[in-house]
Every structure is written in structure tokens, then in C-alpha cells.
């Protein structure tokens, strides 16, 4: 799994933003956003979803499986609530995640 943090070390005491790209894309689409949010005091987690960019393994087969993968990621990092910003397929993942794990999400931003 590849995660970019906008150049700032992760601190689980700060609010966290997960930036999720669309199908066939990578974390690179969020490069400027990563730096901006990190400079504003947020933890930034800009992932390459499985099967994309620098992340190993095959693509996951469904939105639900990717949502479960996201849940595992935030559990491993000890994040209690997360802000998800999703683009295209990342928006679908955010919607599914928010509907199934409402206690783990503080905000959801959808980008066409």
C-alpha cells in the first residue's frame, strides 16, 4: 500500500483527511491538495488504491471491498474519525463507507 502524507509526519492527534482518487488514477491527482491540507494542520493520507500506482496487488473487485480496505487502514492508524474527500470512484467509495461506518466519518466531500 502506498500513502502520501503531503510531506508531514502522521500525528494521530490531528484531524485526518483521506484523499481517494478515481479508477485508473493515482494519488498524484491530489498533489497540491495534500500540501495545502498538511500545511493547515491536517494529517493527509493520499492513497494509491490496490492495483493503482505504487500500491501492490490486484485491484479490489467491488466498492464494498475497497470500503473495507479503507476501514482496515484507518483502524491500523488508530484514527477515530476521518474526513473523506473522493473523486469519481473515490466518491462512490466514500458514500459506501459513510453509509456502512457512520461512526468513523466526520465529513464527506464528493468531487465529480
Model regions: which residues?
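Catalytic nucleophile-loop/oxyanion-hole region of alpha/beta-hydrolase
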Residues: 56-67
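Membrane-interface segments of envelope glycosyltransferases acting on lipid-linked substrates or membrane lipids
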Residues: 6, 23, 42-48, 68-71, ...
Amino acid at each position: 500500500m502506498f500513502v502520501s502524507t503531503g510531506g508531514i509526519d502522521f500525528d494521530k492527534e490531528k484531524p485526518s483527511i483521506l484523499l481517494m482518487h478515481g479508477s485508473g488514477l493515482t494519488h498524484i491527482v491530489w498533489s497540491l491538495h495534500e500540501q495545502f491540507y498538511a500545511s493547515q494542520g491536517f494529517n493527509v493520507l493520499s492513497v494509491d488504491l490496490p492495483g493503482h500506482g505504487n500500491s501492490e496487488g490486484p485491484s479490489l473487485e467491488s466498492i464494498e471491498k475497497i470500503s473495507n480496505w479503507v476501514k482496515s487502514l484507518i483502524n491500523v492508524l488508530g484514527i477515530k474519525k476521518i474526513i473523506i474527500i473522493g473523486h469519481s470512484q473515490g466518491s462512490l467509495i466514500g458514500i459506501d463507507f459513510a453509509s456502512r461506518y457512520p461512526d468513523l466519518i466526520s465529513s464527506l466531500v464528493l468531487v465529480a
